[in-house]
Amino acid sequence: MVAFTVDQMRSLMDKVTNVRNMSVIAHVDHGKSTLTDSLVQRAGIISAAKAGEARFTDTRKDEQERGITIKSTAISLYSEMSDEDVKEIKQKTDGNSFLINLIDSPGHVDFSSEVTAALRVTDGALVVVDTIEGVCVQTETVLRQALGERIKPVVVINKVDRALLELQVSKEDLYQTFARTVESVNVIVSTYADEVLGDVQVYPARGTVAFGSGLHGWAFTIRQFATRYAKKFGVDKAKMMDRLWGDSFFNPKTKKWTNKDTDAEGKPLERAFNMFILDPIFRLFTAIMNFKKDEIPVLLEKLEIVLKGDEKDLEGKALLKVVMRKFLPAADALLEMIVLHLPSPVTAQAYRAEQLYEGPADDANCIAIKNCDPKADLMLYVSKMVPTSDKGRFYAFGRVFAGTVKSGQKVRIQGPNYVPGKKDDLFIKAIQRVVLMMGRFVEPIDDCPAGNIIGLVGIDQFLLKTGTLTTSETAHNMKVMKFSVSPVVQVAVEVKNANDLPKLVEGLKRLSKSDPCVLTYMSESGEHIVAGTGELHLEICLQDLEHDHAGVPLKISPPVVAYRETVESESSQTALSKSPNKHNRIYLKAEPIDEEVSLAIENGIINPRDDFKARARIMADDYGWDVTDARKIWCFGPDGNGPNLVIDQTKAVQYLHEIKDSVVAAFQWATKEGPIFGEEMRSVRVNILDVTLHADAIHRGGGQIIPTMRRATYAGFLLADPKIQEPVFLVEIQCPEQAVGGIYSVLNKKRGQVVSEEQRPGTPLFTVKAYLPVNESFGFTGELRQATGGQAFPQMVFDHWSTLGSDPLDPTSKAGEIVLAARKRHGMKEEVPGWQEYYDKL
């Protein structure tokens, strides 16, 4: 345990080469918070007795009750390395003390937006995988997010104690399980990794994989064992590391290494990993768990483990825990892996800068980020807001990428829509103070140089969720984060007592600040809507709203799903609309956009902010668009970045450029609220074929053009075989074989489609993957548990939009029922207007 003061930390912050910013990511319940504990205990915050139970990073009451992590929390740890270890570090270092900023993030699918916020400010990730369950859907989602942010992974295979005690596996089986898990991680890594990163696959023989048990507080890497044996046998450590993994076998008779699993006489040899690493661990486990009093002291002496006074009287699991912790302390293995293999900010920002910064790659600010320069202009990205103990105020939590942030410093606070040279979304204010985030506590400090993670007080009222702080007037923003989930489940919230309304409004503002992925808005009919990514996420948000942010009793409507409106074919005739003064006409047609193009727009591969020539090139080469069309994209909608497009296909129209702004504004409006039931449009492409305009500018202003364009868009849309799309979850369910039948019956009842079912080799568990419409997912978890006797655990994550085949204009069809219910709820006329209503005759 290190006694560790703020001053020591502050001095380490200046040696940026010795800082490591990393996050812990994993599937839900694979043991992130538990592993984090053994690290925190090493840095001197939890007592050793509590590690494994305290879950120090789960700061909220509901996190401790539910046993899940909901918000990501940050902690700074201090670690000292021996000189020979420091020599092995491939990057520049200075001295042997290291500062590790660790962020524990939630594993539950519904909170993956929290994970994104954590990943943005870190350079490395500790991926935790359960030995028995292996790589699950969420491990893959989060790992994909990390690699997309150019973050280097290292892996911990956790819960090895379960494999030994519950499943009683043999050594070779355990080795095969490990090897399979490492392989499935590497498959994901090689699929999604960025070339810039080089080879970021994980190799046990290089020490980038650790094995252990968070609950018992022990872990090891192959490097640690190689170091032990290298000293004992006087061999080279690097050679030893290679031999302790994979197909290498040691023949004790001839004292020779071979890569065949039999010796000359055909007797089977034992794999080196099993013989040198697993054997001592298995022996300890068997001796202690079978209460062999005489064998234990002999083993302990061989392994140089000394028990103190009252520890000698322990037996069974309690003794096992103490012994394993002394033999292989988890913190040593993990800290060594983090310090040796994860990049320092200096190394990482060199290759992450261009991806973090919106402006050109050669301007002063981008170069300062690349060099992680503490003397340059300040560049700080706020990735989220953390509620303080005093109600309604927030710390801004983020990372300094360049420059130094000081208490009392005046900074430019740039929101996500800021454009250099304009005044929108910009505040110039002073930071009241700079604090260090330590899990449940904060420590004030004076200033903080580039490369570190930090909390700021006093700027929360100027930022919604994220933003860039800078002192340079020419600086562009840091790029906005891409969330892999979208808010698709909504509820309407009302107050029970009308006097509390102002508190609700204030509470909704605070809620949308504190959670990066929640949407709050007011609908046409005056309801307050809260949208979240799934049932659990919404439940937590509403609980926060009721108890913390608003603090008043609320009435909550049953959840509703967000739909999208789309078209299936090209408009059957050209839609024409005249302006209110009859002097201007717009002719257009609507047609569908391919799903892959819509996805590319939603995932930011095709970006409205890109150079139009480069964008046209991509669309022509990868998606088969006509280059002239791709160059003439006027805008994306809704909100300027959605998957709907306006294409200018007119020939030689006078004054056309003058109405472009009005057309764009009208299109944003039309795509935000479609004609069928006021939901957003998706995958609709509008081709403007011809425009007739009045010669006098005064007769073709916004007031004439905007309503015309909107009517024309609606008419074209309704003529093009309109359909509605519903959101679909990908569900992954892990369960024992006898429960599979129960899962199928529940899925069939809820319009689910099973995609795959496979057994995990070496375990009795089955993994079922299925598509489940979000609309049907409410109460799914409960029904599933009932049908399978509590043996199945579903994980749901938004996967795609699926088009409903039936006709939304026919009130008797499935789609028509949904439309009718929504129109009633929104207070619109019950029948959908026909295209004639928006179409004008010549």
Swiss-Prot record:
Record's subcellular location: Cytoplasm
Effect annotated for changing I529T: Reduces sensitivity to sordarin
Modified sites of kind N6,N6-dimethyllysine: K509, K613
Pfam name, any one: GTP_EFTU_D2
Activity control note: Inhibited by fusidic acid and sordarin, which prevent the release of eEF2 from the ribosome after the translocation step. While fusidic acid acts on all eukaryotic eEF2, sordarin specifically binds and inhibits only selected fungal eEF2.
InterPro entries: EFG_II (IPR041095), EFG_III/V (IPR035647), EFG_V-like (IPR000640), EFTu-like_2 (IPR004161), G_TR_CS (IPR031157), P-loop_NTPase (IPR027417), Ribosomal_Su5_D2-typ_SF (IPR020568), Ribsml_uS5_D2-typ_fold_subgr (IPR014721)
Keyword RNA-binding: yes
UniProt KW Protein biosynthesis keyword: yes
N6-methyllysine PTM positions: K509, K613
Residues annotated to bind GTP: 26-33, 158-161, 213-215
Family the entry assigns: Belongs to the TRAFAC class translation factor GTPase superfamily. Classic translation factor GTPase family. EF-G/EF-2 subfamily.
Purpose of the protein: Catalyzes the GTP-dependent ribosomal translocation step during translation elongation. During this step, the ribosome changes from the pre-translocational (PRE) to the post-translocational (POST) state as the newly formed A-site-bound peptidyl-tRNA and P-site-bound deacylated tRNA move to the P and E sites, respectively. Catalyzes the coordinated movement of the two tRNA molecules, the mRNA and conformational changes in the ribosome.
Protein name: Elongation factor 2
Organism: Saccharomyces cerevisiae (strain ATCC 204508 / S288c)
Gene this protein is translated from: EFT1
